[in-house]
Amino acid sequence: MSKQQIGVVGMAVMGRNLALNIESRGYTVSVFNRSREKTEEVIAENPGKKLVPYYTVKEFVESLETPRRILLMVKAGAGTDAAIDSLKPYLEKGDIIIDGGNTFFQDTIRRNRELSAEGFNFIGTGVSGGEEGALKGPSIMPGGQKDAYELVAPILTKIAAVAEDGEPCVTYIGADGAGHYVKMVHNGIEYGDMQLIAEAYSLLKGGLNLSNEELANTFTEWNNGELSSYLIDITKDIFTKKDEDGNYLVDVILDEAANKGTGKWTSQSALDLGEPLSLITESVFARYISSLKAQRVAASKVLSGPKAQPAGDKAEFIEKVRRALYLGKIVSYAQGFSQLRAASDEYHWDLNYGEIAKIFRAGCIIRAQFLQKITDAYAENADIANLLLAPYFKKIADEYQQALRDVVAYAVQNGIPVPTFSAAVAYYDSYRAAVLPANLIQAQRDYFGAHTYKRTDKEGIFHTEWLE
């Protein structure tokens, strides 16, 4: 009896759609789910597909060609460990487990180490694109043993999204947890993008009182230019969608933004690495404060503040917000890629930042036209410390910073919260400042804790008895 070329464990929507994607590229696929009903459901809903169901782990593993290639699409955390433990008794040395879940990168590092010691290969793989991407072509970020990756690369290359230039949106990222780390930062950037867009929406509503149709038209125009991206594209559609009662749906959606924790992981890692990931972290905090709905409603009746005044000329203000949004987006990506550099150094991954930007160009949630600009920047200078220093991004910052400053000033004066726009200005000015007031902080630390300090006028480490 012939054996299948790859197996997929986990028949929730992402696992199901990836299995169908793989099958559609000409591969035979074994499928397994912990609950029999899920597997039966997938088979019943997809007659004629080369999906072969198995109902015990042993039969599933034995159905695969060697070295076995097994894609795990199960709940991250304990669920992943349990799935691996159930597979191990039936695996042989050299078999490959691919974890395609939203896994914390430190867990991937641990699993890679443990499984390697037992002779198995483990590829922690970030998969972005949601349900549709999984079925039609996601952006794929694999990390682990390079030789094991080569054995699964043909499949991953065939199922990945394809950019406009014909290149598949998959590349080997690096050792152990590198793939899941890049996916984590991708998700952090996604948080930043979404919050920046939400603040632009708030400014256009609060400052110009634009109707939903006007908002949709504005975002349609934006999507035809520098801001062309998946998130801008779907946002224009959201503005005009109506419910069964004829109401604009976005206007009746509760203003509490949920999260699954991946943005938090990105910010936690930034703290561990000493990286100033301020904009993305503010986007995480913005979701947290949005969840305090009852407190916010109560506070709105107690705490005073300015009432938003008209922002002036409509076309002029819309253009200012557009420019502010684009520069804010650049700052967000500059922070994210700076963190990737710090992580690459810390974990010895040797990341290729230009290649990472390339695989974000299609399939994933943050896909955008300007990602090619990032690839170009790293092609010109692979060692550039920060994307803001690249010629294209410096030019945009020179031209657009006044709009960002004007928009933030308007928002502050009119009581419109813009945490990520504000963070973009603060980061930009801090990064370009040759001198910051941190000298005073060092003096304070030395005063109360004898933490010492360095001087600008002489070498050495100093401590002062401040009360003498």
From Swiss-Prot:
<keyword id="KW-0560">Oxidoreductase</keyword>
<feature type="binding site" description="in other chain">
    <location>
        <begin position="128"/>
        <end position="130"/>
    </location>
    <ligand>
        <name>substrate</name>
    </ligand>
</feature>
<feature type="active site" description="Proton acceptor">
    <location>
        <position position="183"/>
    </location>
</feature>
<dbReference type="InterPro" id="IPR006115">
    <property type="entry name" value="6PGDH_NADP-bd"/>
</dbReference>
<feature type="binding site">
    <location>
        <begin position="10"/>
        <end position="15"/>
    </location>
    <ligand>
        <name>NADP(+)</name>
    </ligand>
</feature>
<dbReference type="GO" id="GO:0009051">
    <property type="term" value="P:pentose-phosphate shunt, oxidative branch"/>
</dbReference>
<dbReference type="GO" id="GO:0016054">
    <property type="term" value="P:organic acid catabolic process"/>
</dbReference>
<dbReference type="Pfam" id="PF03446">
    <property type="entry name" value="NAD_binding_2"/>
</dbReference>
<comment type="pathway">
    <text>Carbohydrate degradation; pentose phosphate pathway; D-ribulose 5-phosphate from D-glucose 6-phosphate (oxidative stage): step 3/3.</text>
</comment>
<dbReference type="InterPro" id="IPR006183">
    <property type="entry name" value="Pgluconate_DH"/>
</dbReference>
<feature type="binding site">
    <location>
        <begin position="33"/>
        <end position="35"/>
    </location>
    <ligand>
        <name>NADP(+)</name>
    </ligand>
</feature>
<dbReference type="GO" id="GO:0006098">
    <property type="term" value="P:pentose-phosphate shunt"/>
</dbReference>
<comment type="similarity">
    <text>Belongs to the 6-phosphogluconate dehydrogenase family.</text>
</comment>
<feature type="binding site" description="in other chain">
    <location>
        <position position="191"/>
    </location>
    <ligand>
        <name>substrate</name>
    </ligand>
</feature>
<dbReference type="InterPro" id="IPR008927">
    <property type="entry name" value="6-PGluconate_DH-like_C_sf"/>
</dbReference>
<comment type="function">
    <text>Catalyzes the oxidative decarboxylation of 6-phosphogluconate to ribulose 5-phosphate and CO(2), with concomitant reduction of NADP to NADPH.</text>
</comment>
<protein>
    <recommendedName>
        <fullName>6-phosphogluconate dehydrogenase, decarboxylating</fullName>
        <ecNumber>1.1.1.44</ecNumber>
    </recommendedName>
</protein>
<feature type="binding site" description="in other chain">
    <location>
        <begin position="186"/>
        <end position="187"/>
    </location>
    <ligand>
        <name>substrate</name>
    </ligand>
</feature>
<feature type="binding site" description="in other chain">
    <location>
        <position position="102"/>
    </location>
    <ligand>
        <name>substrate</name>
    </ligand>
</feature>
<feature type="binding site">
    <location>
        <position position="451"/>
    </location>
    <ligand>
        <name>substrate</name>
    </ligand>
</feature>
<dbReference type="Pfam" id="PF00393">
    <property type="entry name" value="6PGD"/>
</dbReference>
<feature type="binding site">
    <location>
        <position position="102"/>
    </location>
    <ligand>
        <name>NADP(+)</name>
    </ligand>
</feature>
<dbReference type="GO" id="GO:0005829">
    <property type="term" value="C:cytosol"/>
</dbReference>
<feature type="binding site" description="in other chain">
    <location>
        <position position="287"/>
    </location>
    <ligand>
        <name>substrate</name>
    </ligand>
</feature>
<dbReference type="InterPro" id="IPR006114">
    <property type="entry name" value="6PGDH_C"/>
</dbReference>
<dbReference type="InterPro" id="IPR013328">
    <property type="entry name" value="6PGD_dom2"/>
</dbReference>
<feature type="active site" description="Proton donor">
    <location>
        <position position="190"/>
    </location>
</feature>
<keyword id="KW-0521">NADP</keyword>
<dbReference type="InterPro" id="IPR036291">
    <property type="entry name" value="NAD(P)-bd_dom_sf"/>
</dbReference>
<comment type="subunit">
    <text>Homodimer.</text>
</comment>
<keyword id="KW-0570">Pentose shunt</keyword>
<dbReference type="InterPro" id="IPR006113">
    <property type="entry name" value="6PGDH_Gnd/GntZ"/>
</dbReference>
<feature type="binding site" description="in other chain">
    <location>
        <position position="260"/>
    </location>
    <ligand>
        <name>substrate</name>
    </ligand>
</feature>
<feature type="binding site">
    <location>
        <begin position="74"/>
        <end position="76"/>
    </location>
    <ligand>
        <name>NADP(+)</name>
    </ligand>
</feature>
<dbReference type="GO" id="GO:0019521">
    <property type="term" value="P:D-gluconate metabolic process"/>
</dbReference>
<dbReference type="InterPro" id="IPR006184">
    <property type="entry name" value="6PGdom_BS"/>
</dbReference>
<feature type="binding site">
    <location>
        <position position="445"/>
    </location>
    <ligand>
        <name>substrate</name>
    </ligand>
</feature>
<dbReference type="GO" id="GO:0004616">
    <property type="term" value="F:phosphogluconate dehydrogenase (decarboxylating) activity"/>
</dbReference>
<keyword id="KW-0311">Gluconate utilization</keyword>
<dbReference type="GO" id="GO:0050661">
    <property type="term" value="F:NADP binding"/>
</dbReference>
